[in-house]
Curated annotation (Swiss-Prot):
The keyword Membrane applies. It is found in: Golgi apparatus membrane. This is Probable xyloglucan glycosyltransferase 7. InterPro entries: Glyco_trans_2-like, Nucleotide-diphossugar_trans. Residues 619-628 have a biased composition (Basic and acidic residues). It is a multi-pass membrane protein. Its EC number is 2.4.1.-. Keywords: Cell wall biogenesis/degradation, Glycosyltransferase, Golgi apparatus, Membrane, Transferase, Transmembrane, Transmembrane helix. Belongs to the glycosyltransferase 2 family. Plant cellulose synthase-like C subfamily. The gene is CSLC7. Probable beta-1,4-glucan synthase rather involved in the synthesis of the xyloglucan backbone than cellulose. Seems to work simultaneously with xyloglucan 6-xylosyltransferase. Xyloglucan is a noncellulosic polysaccharides of plant cell wall and consists of a glucan backbone substituted by xylose, galactose and fucose. It comes from Oryza sativa subsp. japonica (Rice).
């Protein structure tokens, strides 16, 4: 028989007696108390009935509370297990780490050692100062004036008084001057960012977008009007990019354009014989399908990508083509790409370049790709679109763009003098008076670097090259015939503010000056510079990618962390150091952009394999390579500069506690943790 407290009868509960009935829903896994209701004790009931009922109810409540406690303990255990798993994974990744990450093929060992040594000396000095400040804080001397400290007996008190006088008279004034200068640069750059965002808002509000005078895309039958389509040359430079060549070649060969009016050049600079054989076989397969496609492999591989493109443009048949389209090896254009870009040249003889924006197939792969997506969305949505709409000039992105061949030739063609040949040709074309068009609604999908090592090398090239180019073309800009405001935009905004000042103040202000002001509190860095303005700028940066809003704090911290790499790259490019000439092909993973596109490529591949004999040597090598690759182990790289800066910032955070600077403390703490995560290579994928 069920106990009396199990349910409630119509007679008013437990034998119509007193007590506090408790209904427990047993089917509820939460074991929650669903009803606790006091009932009046019926007249004439035994005196102990109420107490007995309350005793039983108390026991039931105890059991429910115990079950809740058990569940809470289970949650804590799960959280602890997850934390241990993360710590264990971090330990394994760190244990397999390599400390050669800071090495660059062209960088001198002495220069690299000096850079790391300066950071290490700063760290040791900050630790010593922290120990001194803690001891002085315990003595209460941080509240005393220098004169009162001199009256205190003891060597330590006199030494600390001398340190305070040194700070006040000699260290604080120049540090405050440098702080004010960096804050001024920070404000100028923030105003520039705000103006760009206002320009983007105006473009959206007014619906401003480039409109072609005549759209070839309106014709339903491609072959019917082939004579109305201009001749287009498609170039695909690649180098040892085995993971992506097949899908990118397939995407280009399926472009919706009369086959007689476009030619594909696969410009293979691979030094791996197996990769070259596979690419050549893929080209031959599409040739048998009727596509006009040519395979080119240079014997003398000089000049990197610029040399490859320059060699291809020297072919005799190039004179028969009016436009040239460039796709890097990981880019997968939509079938209507040419129909949406080439018409913008018609009737506009002064247009030299039409640039499409990038989209990314792996933007949600990990935290690193998400943060890159925020940066590049702002770059295309705001910077490129605004500059294209109002100035008719922006930096060519190196791929997913259509050039008028006449504009290339008029600008001097491709040059190998820097590692940013795309920006080089864009600046020279702008100086010749050519106009650029940016199409924000035409996207070409590609990959983002998934490992920090690959991303770091890419960013080094992207930030050292512009400084090389600025040195080389500064005189040409001054002597050019373009207007004063175009010269001002090119020199001050395009090069100095966005390529030099931005990485300079980011590193100097947040990684050098801010920690120093903690140990020299007489020099002040306002809280609005540390927190409020950067937060506002981060919100503006993340607006073009609203789905990434939850990552706004990691984005802000990661951008400051990357300032070390960007600052080093800027210095190497400005002073022509060895690492400024380093060119490393960004590692690809071979992710597909569209399922139907891949299916189409696979369909053609299957048909071709049935009807033709494969290259047995290439296939044999291809089958043997996975076995070799399976033996490769992924490992982490240890970045010593980032680790040293992490400990420096954490030390400064501890010092800020003594000054009761809350905002500075939290910023330094989280920024130090961010440097630690990056220094241990715990962001992004591991490298093989």
């Amino acid at each position: 028989m069920a106990p009396s407290w199990w349910g409630r009868s119509g007679g008013g509960g437990v034998g119509n007696g007193g007590g506090t009935p408790v209904v427990v829903k047993m089917e509820n896994p939460n074991w929650s108390i669903s009803e606790v209701e006091a009932a009046e004790v019926a007249p004439g009931s035994p005196a102990g009935a109420g107490k007995a009922g309350r005793g039983k109810n108390a026991r039931q409540i105890t059991w429910v509370l115990l079950l809740k406690a058990h569940r809470a303990a289970g949650r804590l255990t799960g959280a602890a297990s997850a934390a241990l798993a993360v710590a264990s994974a971090a330990r394994r990744r760190v244990a397999s780490g390599r400390t050669d990450a800071d090495a660059a093929p062209g960088e001198s060992t002495a220069l690299r050692a000096r850079s790391y040594g300066c950071i290490r000396v700063s760290l040791v000095l900050s630790l010593l100062l922290l120990a001194v400040e803690v001891a002085a804080y315990l003595q209460g001397w941080h509240l005393e004036e220098v004169a009162s400290l001199l009256a205190v007996d003891g060597l330590f008190a006199a030494s600390y008084a001398g340190w305070m006088r040194l700070r006040l008279d000699y260290l604080a004034p120049p540090l405050q001057f440098l702080t004010n200068a960096c804050v001024a640069l920070f404000m100028v750059q923030s105003i520039d960012r705000l103006v760009l965002c206002l320009g983007c808002f105006w473009i959206r509000f007014k619906g401003i977008k480039p409109v072609p005078q005549a759209a070839a895309a309106g014709k339903p039958d491609v072959e019917a009007g082939a004579g109305d389509y201009p001749m287009v040359l498609v170039q695909m430079p690649m180098c040892n990019e085995r993971e992506v060549y097949q899908q990118s070649i397939g995407a280009v060969c399926n472009l919706d354009w009369p086959k007689s009016n476009f030619l594909v050049q696969v410009l293979d600079d691979s030094d791996d014989a197996t990769t070259s054989a596979l690419i050549k076989e893929e080209v031959e397969k599409w040739q048998r399908e009727g596509v006009r496609i040519i395979y080119r492999h240079r014997v003398i591989r000089d000049g990197y990508k610029a040399g490859n493109l320059k060699s291809a443009m020297n072919c005799s048949y190039v004179k028969d083509y009016e436009f040239v389209v460039i796709f890097d090896a990981d880019f997968q254009p939509q079938a209507d790409f040419l129909k949406r870009t080439v018409p913008h040249f018609k009737g506009k003889d002064d247009v030299g370049l039409v640039q499409a924006r990038w989209s990314f197939v792996n933007k949600d792969e990990n935290l690193l790709t998400r943060l890159q997506n925020v940066n590049l969305c702002f770059h295309f949505e705001v910077e490129q679109q605004v500059n294209g709409a109002f100035l008719n000039f922006f930096g060519f992105n190196g791929t997913a763009g259509v050039w008028r061949i006449k504009a290339l030739e008029d600008s001097g063609g491709w040059m190998e003098r820097t590692t940013v040949e795309d920006m080089d040709i864009a600046v020279r074309a702008h100086l010749k008076g050519w106009k650029f068009v940016f199409l924000n609604d035409v996207e070409c999908q590609c990959e983002l670097p998934e490992s920090y090592e690959a991303y770091r090398k890419q960013q080094h090239r992207w930030h050292s090259g512009p400084m090389q180019l600025f040195r080389l073309c500064f005189v040409d800009i001054i002597k050019s015939k373009i207007g004063f405001w175009k010269k001002f935009n090119l020199i001050f905004l395009f090069f100095l503010l966005r390529k030099l000042i931005l990485p300079f103040y980011s590193f100097t202000l947040f990684c050098v000056i801010l920690p120093m002001t903690m140990f020299v509190p007489e020099a002040e860095l306002p809280a609005w510079v540390v927190c409020y303005i950067p937060a506002t700028m981060s919100i503006l940066n993340i607006l073009p990618a609203p789905k990434s809003f939850p990552f706004i704090v990691p984005y802000l911290l990661f951008e400051n962390t990357m300032s070390v790499t960007k600052f080093n790259a800027m210095i190497s490019g400005l002073f022509q150091l060895g690492s400024a000439y380093e060119w490393v092909v960004t590692k690809k993973s071979g992710r597909s952009s569209e399922g139907d596109l891949v299916g189409l490529v696979e369909k053609h591949s299957k048909q071709q394999r049935v009807g033709s004999a494969p290259n047995l040597d290439a296939l044999t090598k291809e089958e043997s390579n996975p076995k070799k690759d399976s033996k490769k182990k992924k490992h982490n790289r240890i970045y010593r500069k980032e680790l040293a800066l992490s400990f420096l910032l954490l030390t400064a955070a501890a010092r800020s506690l003594l000054s009761a600077q809350g905002i500075h403390f939290y910023f330094l703490l989280f920024q130090g943790v961010s440097f630690l995560v990056v220094g241990l290579d715990l962001i992004g994928e591991q490298v093989e």
